[in-house]
């Protein structure tokens, strides 16, 4: 089972042409693992959250491909489309939790971690091309727009952005080609990250 790639913190957003930039949603990191009819949700800390977030599980079962691993962030979205960490953390909205999917680590029995990110993103888009509710592919921008995107994220009160090099493979642990730049005014900046509620 794949472990998690983790971004390094930075103060400056990469601006080269080979970088993808994603808005950082404020949620819990999860991998969705499907093997036939069996779906599991694995947290970054190794916990099993399969029974906690039924919408994600039901959606994963509806996807036509029946063997895959996707990486993403479990979120509760407000009416404005912005992730609401307090609603997620409270546990009162577990039936509404969706997955913001940003990577695909395996599909149809093939390990995709050695593929470049750009190709993994293409595979993820194909997997989710029917736009199943409950799991959605993370939008991203490419290239020089990164610093401008970060400024806009801060203006809208979002957590920040994560920038990833399009040609790099997926490695467990801290990755210098995944760079997180956080909005210092956002509550998540001072909060201990990815702390799941007690089971």
Task: Locate predicted features.
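Catalytic cores of nucleic-acid ligases and guanylyltransferases
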Residues: 1-199
């Amino acid at each position: 089972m794949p472990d998690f790639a983790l971004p390094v913190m930075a103060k400056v957003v990469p601006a080269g042409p080979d970088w993808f930039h994603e808005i950082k949603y404020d949620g819990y990191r999860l991998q969705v693992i499907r093997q036939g009819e069996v779906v599991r949700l694995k947290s970054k800390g190794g916990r099993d959250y399969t029974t906690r977030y039924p919408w994600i599980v039901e959606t994963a079962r509806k996807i036509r491909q029946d063997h895959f691993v996707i990486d993403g962030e479990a979120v509760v979205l407000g009416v404005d489309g912005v992730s609401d960490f307090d609603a997620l953390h409270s546990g009162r909205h577990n039936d509404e939790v969706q997955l913001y999917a940003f990577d695909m680590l395996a599909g149809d029995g093939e390990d995709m971690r050695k593929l470049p990110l750009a190709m993994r993103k293409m595979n993820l888009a194909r997997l989710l091309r029917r736009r199943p509710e409950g799991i959605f592919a993370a939008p991203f921008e490419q290239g020089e727009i990164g610093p401008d995107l970060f400024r806009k994220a801060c203006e809208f009160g979002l957590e920040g952005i994560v920038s990833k090099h399009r040609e790099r493979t997926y490695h467990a642990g801290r990755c210098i080609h995944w760079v997180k730049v956080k909005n210092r005014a956002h509550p998540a900046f001072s909060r201990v990250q990815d702390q799941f509620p007690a089971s």
